[in-house]
Amino acid sequence: MQFNPKAPTGLMVGRYQPWHRGHRALFEKILSIAGQVCIGVRDTHGTTEKDPLPIEDVISRIHEDLEQDYAGKYTIWQLPNISGVYYGRDVGYKVEQ
């Protein structure tokens, strides 16, 4: 199975410094709702003491955790250091916590 960019997709955005069981649980919840997941990794390496991992390491760790069980069900995007999410009215998707 291959990730389908035209299929309904859930989006999760974070630093994942480091990726852990709670992130995986959120991924699994989003997957059960949306069918596939886009994981947006904010590139925050070195901005604070809480961001020690280079983005390449973060992405590698996420793949190591998910690939065996969820190949084709997710994609990972490198993002800039997003500090806010803004949207217009009637954009065609929900914003949930």
Label every PLM stretch briefly.
Residues M1-Q97:
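Nucleotidyltransferase catalytic core that binds NTPs
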